[in-house]
Each structure stands twice: as C-alpha cells, then as structure tokens.
Amino acid sequence: VIISSRCVGIDVSKHHLDIFDEAVGVSERIDNATHAITQLVARWRCDALVVFEATGVYDLELREALHRAGIRFARINPARARDFARASGQLAKTDPIDAQMLAAFARAMKPATEQAATPARNALAKLAKRRDQLVAMRAQEKNRRSEAEDRAMAERIARLIEVLNDEIAEIETEINALVKAEPELADDAQLMRSVPGVGPVACMQLLTQMPELGRLGPKEVAALAGLAPFNVDSGAYRGKRKIGGGRKRVRDALYMAALNAIRRADRFKAFYDRLRQAGKPAKLALIAVARKLLTILNAMLRDRKIYKVAPST
C-alpha cells in the first residue's frame, strides 16, 4: 500500500466541486469545468490520494485531469461513504462536510485506486450509459403497452417502442465500431467473448465499468463488482453472508452472464449444480457463478490468454 502524504475529498455535483484538502484544512468550491479543474489538480503532487463518490458522467472531467497529472484517485459507492460518516458520528450532510468526510475516509480506509480510463473507454462509457437509459425507457413503454386501455393507445405506444428499438440498434452499431477501431478494446473484447455466457452486453459493461480488470487480484475485483460476500455476525449470532456495494452495472451484467453460462457450459453448470445440491439457494449459487466468471475474466486479461474449455470442477 502506498502511504499518501496528502488525502483530498471531493464532493461532485453537476455544476461545482466541493474540495477538502487535509494538508491545508480548508474547504473550497470551484466550478465543475475543465479550466478550474486543471488549475486545482496542478496544486497536488503524485503522492496525493483523491477520493470522491461515483456520480456517473459528472466526475468525468475530474477523472481525466487526475489521470493526466498522474494522481491516484478512488471512486467509492455513495452508501459506503455515508456509512463511514455515520460510524464517525457525523450525521449532518452538506457538500463541504461530505468533502471533509471523504478526505477522512481516504486516510482511514486507504481505498483501492481506480485505473484511469482511456479516451476511447470514456467515449464507450457514454454510449453504454445512453443505451442503458434507452433500454430502461423501452421496458417502461412495454409495461404501459400491456396496460393500455384500448387498441389505439397500444398501437401508439408500439410506435414509440419501435423508435427506441431503432435508436438502441444505432447506438449498438456505434459501440461495435468503436470497439473494433481501438486495438486495446478489440483485444479485451475478444478475450471476454471467448468465455461461455459473456455476450455483447456483459462485455460492454466490463469494458466501460471495470478498467481495472486484469490489473488487480481476484478478491479486489470481486469487491469492486460488489460480488465479495461479507459477514453479518454479532456475538453468538451468525447471519447469512451477503453481497452489496460495488458497481451495480457490472454485477447485474455478470449475473445475466452466469445465467447464460450454466445453460451453455458444462463447467459452470456442474459448479452451479454442486452448490444447489449442497443446499445453497438458487440466487446465491448464481452469484457464486458470477464471481467465478469474474475471477476467470480477470486472470485471462492479466495473462492475455483466451478461454479454454476445462473439465468440470
């Protein structure tokens, strides 16, 4: 673990950033704009650790500036930050207070830093996010169509669904073209797609949401994806192991990939069946398959080796 001489917490919003730099002990606010962020990052050395909550595209300028400056940063799940604040006795919540708590989190917890994404991955992430939005809109419209009060309304909704289908198809074409045009993305995608169950959607989410894949250990990537089980124990009580936190899009994509894998590959089907025969619930067994898939993918990208069919284990 690299010991940081300077920990910085940043609360990110659409229009501004609230910063608490523990080295100076003062909070400040700047515009969430390229020029202001560049000036801010120029103050820090490469031994700084910057922590902020994952906020989708609002932190993109910040991430790119930190990457260019060679400064380590960690994006954390907002729930994890809030739990830390409560455990520290901080119940008040304002943007400056949040920034201060994130700096304290950086010092106390030393979170794993994020592998900065390339411009191509950032472009892919924007397309993937828009695709996710359109898919969610389509699902809503399909529900409305099933509840339509008359045929005319159902047909009106159906026309909108067709528009969404066309837009989704267009974005998927752009995504495929971008992946093929970028050698690093194309190579990673080829490795991922060789694994049974990993289709284009899971591949897209892993490319955009897990740039660390292949660069960290299995426990670390499982924690980032929210697939690492944690204990719920107290005294003599032994609760069920649970998963949570992490990157929801990655976790959801791997869960669907696990469903496909147990249908298509004997290795994963046998692993799933053993867990079920041992009394594990179906959902827990699928989560275990998802974690196994992630572990395999991580090793493949680390070693740059394509998937090979292995005997059931």
Label each region the model flagged:
Residues V24-L49:
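Nucleic-acid-processing active sites and adjacent nucleic-acid-binding tracks
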Residues P200, Q205-A278, A282, V309:
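Phosphate-backbone recognition surface of nucleic-acid-processing proteins
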